[in-house]
Amino acid sequence: MRVFTPSHKVQSNPLWRTVGFPSSSGPHLNAILNEGLPVTIVDKIQNWSTFGKGDILRIAGIQIRSYSRRCSGKGKFTADESQRIARFVRVMDHAVDLFNGDKDKAAQWMKRPIRGLGYVTPESMLDTESGALDVMNLIGRIEHGIVS
């Protein structure tokens, strides 16, 4: 069994900052999400992470056709779609922190079935807020050395 030794290295460039969120949570972010995120945020996430555009949209539960319509229309996601993208950003930042800033390892972990999640992938849990909380709670348990 491998032993996890946490380091307290803080990400110098978290995803939430890269995509232009004022913070990772709070009333200002909530107002931005309710207004609708610009569709260009998907490109920013893709450039920062190792996830492709299709993967990001799938994980966020946004159909490619809806994305295409948003691109040719107002250029913004709906409030609901924006919340789902923010959920992905939040969880991905926590996963990258878990792996001490290694985005590749975090992405691999997100795609692997995890025992602590009932042998489903963390990315598949992001379709609901409670699933995302389960993933973030698992990350917290791992960071604190609680076997999951």
Curated annotation (Swiss-Prot):
One of its GO terms (molecular function) is DNA binding. Keywords: Toxin-antitoxin system. InterPro entries: Antitox_Xre, Xre-like_HTH, Xre/MbcA/ParS-like_toxin-bd. Pfam families: Xre-like-HTH, Xre_MbcA_ParS_C. Belongs to the MbcA/ParS/Xre antitoxin family. Antitoxin component of a type II toxin-antitoxin (TA) system. Neutralizes the NAD(+) depleting activity of cognate toxin Res. Homodimer. Forms a complex with cognate toxin Rse. This is Antitoxin Xre.
